[in-house]
């Protein structure tokens, strides 16, 4: 059984390793797509790696590195979201890391759904090594080794650059005719001190740009999964995290750890509306529609002291502090023609400001005996924005009873809070000159979980969990409607709400089962499944399905490695995924025409579903191990059966001037996608 890194974690915690992200079909070396194999966790759609944890919005998921919550670590990220089409995080520089899906320890605040606690591994401090790889998603290079022959200090550096243009010329369909450009990097210097203590200097970041020019597509090109099919869009993002982590043992029973870093993120875009001649596809005009530029710079510190009081008691005390400068600007046309004059535009966002957030915590672990272990903790969250942005006491509790050497029961309780995406506070509604949501408060979630695990064999484990989550303080519109922020966060669209209040509620409950055969004797297998329900009640008082209530999800993965000659290994892996279809409602054609995007009627919203989701993936690798070098080629065949899984509706007016259902197009997720790579290690 694989234990998580955090000793305070009792329940709803999983460790994932580099080995798993390499072997699992369809994971693409991405921590988020890897986590979607866990019970209770599923991807939002094929074009992005947002994850839905126990029916919650992806907005409730955070990423942490060295105790610091980092910005969205994905290329082409939307402000406030947690996912994107392609991860900046690369499994080659990550060490074994933890993922939490509920009632997480008290050191993890400002999250109501899930937490990635990621570790950047140290470089090899004995010899210099090099890894090079080229494939569909980029050409990448990694080098690591000792900094000096006279110490155990090491370095690790990695860089990746996009190669999609070359593969698009070969006819590979990525869901868009545009060519995304991106690059990312990671670096770490690990510096142990002779008299004890360690300093690590690390950084990671990425830059991305795409121009989706629908106007230049032919009529036969079809829809674009990454853009609106009535607009030309230019979109760019970047993020950078750079920090220093210091650890030092104070004595044999205690140590301190402190991380200080700066986080920088930017998203910018401009859109032009396409007006086509209904009788001639190639006859069109472009009218400026909107442009925005969002910037944030955050300075963070995470510090803690860990003390083993005696054989039975361990105490951890610490805090996370963040100071943020931000600048949000966005203007949009005020008329359908969108003439390029100053008086035809209005600000949707126009705010320069700063904020401070502080999260102190304490965690305690007590061993009543080898059979019974308790963890308990308290945390608090304070944000200096809004009238209800202080959560003074959030208790966390975990209890584990080891029935025998093979089986155990676990129990967890947690009270969690989370701030809203920062930009949502500063939206300026049409007809107003001031933002009207600056006093948004926190969202709260109470978790209760009961689990059972059985180590059937040394390489085979069974785990089941049942859970219930009660959510309050969800932002909903003050005017009665079906809108709730709990349905946001899984796509490329930002939120432009009316006046909001924290009066929405919701709940999630479910049953999860995992049966895992760990890699041994050259093969592994995993089955994970969940049955769940996810509901919310907005300001109109009508209980509805959340947009993420698919009701069920199941995964089966298996893989085996074969020795096919001296120093040669053939690897085969399969993955089968089934899940409930995406929620939908009845489209309002008139409102959609007014807004230029799909608008659903409040009546019957999310009552119906698209057809259920199915995907079959196969991964094949061939590795040649030589004395000083290793070669590996691989191909991941995603959606091998070309299953037509429905993504959503989009607004695509046919030009006849009549607002009706003919203006609404049905979009499908990615079809068959072959992902090839070649890798060399020496």
Predicted feature locations:
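Periplasmic N-terminal accessory/gating domains of Gram-negative outer-membrane beta-barrel systems
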Residues: 2-104, 115, 121
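Surface-exposed extracellular loop regions of Gram-negative outer-membrane beta-barrel proteins
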Residues: 74, 215-220, 406-448, 468-494, ...
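Transmembrane beta-barrel wall of Gram-negative outer-membrane proteins
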Residues: 135-161, 174-213, 234-258, 262, ...
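Flexible loop and strand-edge segments within Gram-negative outer membrane beta-barrel domains
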Residues: 198-249, 264-295
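Outer-membrane beta-barrel signature, preferentially recognizing the C-terminal barrel domain
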Residues: 228-249, 353, 417-471, 488-518, ...
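Outer membrane beta-barrel strand-and-loop segments of large Gram-negative receptors
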Residues: 289-290, 294, 298-302, 348-353, ...
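Gram-negative outer-membrane beta-barrel transporters
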Residues: 468-470, 492-582
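C-terminal beta-signal and adjacent terminal beta-strands/loops
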Residues: 472, 525, 577-596, 613-615, ...
